[in-house]
């Protein structure tokens, strides 16, 4: 099953032609690898002895100038589960829309190695051709915890990137 090579090629073509792909958690890992995005998954390959957050609430600092932040406060919460991640931009064309809190981002639950993602990108917009890929490192639609992050997901789906950003490439 899965997309296969033809499906990945079609997805790549869709985004490069001006489409928007929104990927959550583990799907972000797929998008990074399949589309060759200039972003590194910061928790990939870490052992559970070094990093393990099985389902906790972390502080999220929102970059207010991001289009994804429309209607959002500067600080909110995010559900970080077993499939969640953090990102490190590795090239041009990556805009950080939200970061995990600095210091100790843990607000509720428990975490091993949370300092590894403190201050790291949690939500990024990545230019890809004339389109973009929006990568969520956390789950913005997890039960009632998501009331704080639904707007980020809705903004990713409904608000186009500013024309100047796409046209200026």
Predicted regions and their residues:
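Short secondary-structure boundary/capping segments
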Residues: 36-41, 150-152
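Short His-Asn-centered micro-motif
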Residues: 23-26, 43, 64
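Aromatic- and carboxylate-enriched substrate-binding clefts and catalytic-loop regions
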Residues: 1-4, 29, 42-51, 56
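Short amphipathic C-terminal alpha-helix that caps PH/PH-like domains
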Residues: 149-160
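Low-complexity, Gly/Pro
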Residues: 23, 32, 123, 157, ...
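Short alpha-beta junction capping motif
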Residues: 1-30, 130, 156
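Active-site-proximal structural scaffolding
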Residues: 4-7, 14-15, 24, 51-53, ...
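Catalytic beta-strand/loop cores that center a nucleophilic Ser/Cys/Thr
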Residues: 39-41, 48-49, 56-146, 161-166
């Amino acid at each position: 099953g899965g997309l296969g090579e033809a499906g990945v090629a079609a997805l790549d073509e869709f985004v490069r032609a001006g489409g928007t792909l929104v990927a959550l958690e583990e799907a972000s890992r797929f998008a990074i690898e399949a589309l060759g995005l200039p972003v590194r998954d910061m928790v990939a390959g870490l052992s559970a002895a070094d990093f393990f957050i099985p389902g906790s609430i972390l502080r999220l600092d929102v970059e207010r100038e991001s289009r994804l932040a429309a209607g959002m406060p500067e600080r909110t919460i995010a559900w970080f589960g077993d499939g969640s991640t953090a990102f490190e931009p590795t090239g041009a064309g990556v805009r950080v829309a939200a970061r995990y809190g600095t210091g100790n981002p843990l607000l509720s639950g428990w975490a091993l190695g949370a300092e590894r993602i403190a201050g790291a990108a949690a939500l990024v917009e990545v230019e890809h051709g004339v389109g973009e890929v929006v990568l969520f490192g956390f789950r913005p639609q997890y039960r009632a915890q998501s009331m704080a992050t639904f707007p980020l997901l809705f903004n990713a789906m409904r608000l186009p990137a500013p024309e100047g950003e796409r046209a200026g490439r």
